[in-house]
Amino acid sequence: MAFSATVSQLSSLSTISSSLPISSRRLPHRSLPQFTVKAEAEKEKQSTQGKSDGEASPAATKTPKTLPKKPVYSMKKGQIVRVEKEKYLNSINYLSVGHPPFYKGLDYIYEDRGEVLDLRVFETGEYALVGWVGIPTAPAWLPTDMLIKCEKLVYERM
């Protein structure tokens, strides 16, 4: 019964909509002439600007696109590094962690087992993402000025 009531309501709506005038059911395309007028006005503006620009200098209108230069890094990815102990202990990286006064950092960061995973230039300077080989810890972003380049990886698995 509910289905038959719904069908009868739909059929009554269709008879009401068919009795309405056509102009109220369909929206006329009033915006179409406005777009053509705007396009014609823009063409006129461009033609007047083209004449004035053509008289001034045609080379000034064509400017080559310059791509941003790639930054030059002091290190490269995959390079083996170690952290300079004195610079690290006096840095904001060490002081912001809140270590106790007697704590002098983890020994493995001062050994030749750090690998540069990524390099970025931030507002505060050039930083390297350093991961330590054989140490199950997360990599850390450290300033490149406190890193010392090493020739080879000095690491013995225990």
Curated annotation (Swiss-Prot):
Major subcellular location class: plastid
UniProt-recorded name of the protein: NAD(P)H-quinone oxidoreductase subunit O, chloroplastic
Gene that specifies this protein: ndhO
Physiological role: NDH shuttles electrons from NAD(P)H:plastoquinone, via FMN and iron-sulfur (Fe-S) centers, to quinones in the photosynthetic chain and possibly in a chloroplast respiratory chain. The immediate electron acceptor for the enzyme in this species is believed to be plastoquinone. Couples the redox reaction to proton translocation, and thus conserves the redox energy in a proton gradient.
Disruption phenotype: Malfunction of the NDH complex.
Pfam families in the record: NdhO
Gene Ontology CC terms, in alphabetical order: chloroplast; chloroplast thylakoid membrane; mitochondrion; NAD(P)H dehydrogenase complex (plastoquinone); plasma membrane
Catalysis performed (reactions): a plastoquinone + NADH + (n+1) H(+)(in) = a plastoquinol + NAD(+) + n H(+)(out); a plastoquinone + NADPH + (n+1) H(+)(in) = a plastoquinol + NADP(+) + n H(+)(out)
Organism: Arabidopsis thaliana (Mouse-ear cress)
Family to which the UniProt record says this protein belongs: Belongs to the NDH complex subunit O family.
Keyword field contains Transit peptide: yes
Record key words, sorted: Chloroplast, Membrane, NAD, NADP, Plastid, Plastoquinone, Quinone, Thylakoid, Transit peptide, Translocase, Transport
Biased composition (Low complexity): 56-70
Assembly notes: Part of the chloroplast NDH complex, composed of a mixture of chloroplast and nucleus encoded subunits. Component of the NDH subcomplex A, at least composed of ndhH, ndhI, ndhJ, ndhK, ndhL, ndhM, ndhN and ndhO.
Membrane topology: Peripheral membrane protein
